[in-house]
């Protein structure tokens, strides 16, 4: 189910404070966060946010197309190694 419009998008408070601090100081370092559940807001455009994927922080540069999506969508948690080909099919 989608989130109610009257509630508005969810963003963790600590992440919002970090974004406001970076906007004021003009700092170019990525913002580290573990909050994969936070929604990307228009205030985040142009910032690099390092989103944790369970093992490391993946840098994500926020663009206009990402607004409204969750940060976790851009930091993959599973590595796909590929399917193994059938040995019988090769012959």
UniProtKB/Swiss-Prot annotation:
Keyword set includes Protein biosynthesis: no
Listed GO MF terms: rRNA binding; structural constituent of ribosome
GO cellular component, one term: small ribosomal subunit
GO biological process, one term: ribosomal small subunit assembly
Pfam families the UniProt entry points to: Ribosomal_S19 (PF00203)
Keywords, in A-Z order: Ribonucleoprotein, Ribosomal protein, RNA-binding, rRNA-binding
Coiled coil location: none
InterPro entries on file: Ribosomal_uS19, Ribosomal_uS19_bac-type, Ribosomal_uS19_CS, Ribosomal_uS19_SF
SUPFAM superfamilies the UniProt entry points to: Ribosomal protein S19 (SSF54570)
Domain of life: Bacteria
Function of the molecule: Protein S19 forms a complex with S13 that binds strongly to the 16S ribosomal RNA.
UniProt record similarity statement: Belongs to the universal ribosomal protein uS19 family.
This protein's name: Small ribosomal subunit protein uS19
Lineage: Bacteria, Pseudomonadati, Pseudomonadota, Betaproteobacteria, Nitrosomonadales
Gene: rpsS
């Amino acid at each position: 189910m989608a989130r109610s419009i009257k509630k508005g998008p969810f963003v963790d408070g600590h992440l919002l404070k970090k974004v406001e601090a970076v906007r004021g100081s003009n700092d170019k370092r990525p913002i580290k966060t573990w909050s994969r559940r936070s929604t990307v807001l228009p205030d985040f455009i142009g910032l690099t946010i390092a989103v944790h994927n369970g093992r490391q922080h993946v840098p994500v540069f926020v663009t206009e197309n990402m607004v409204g999506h969750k940060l976790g969508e851009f930091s993959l948690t599973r590595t796909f190694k590929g399917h193994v080909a059938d040995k019988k099919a090769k012959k």
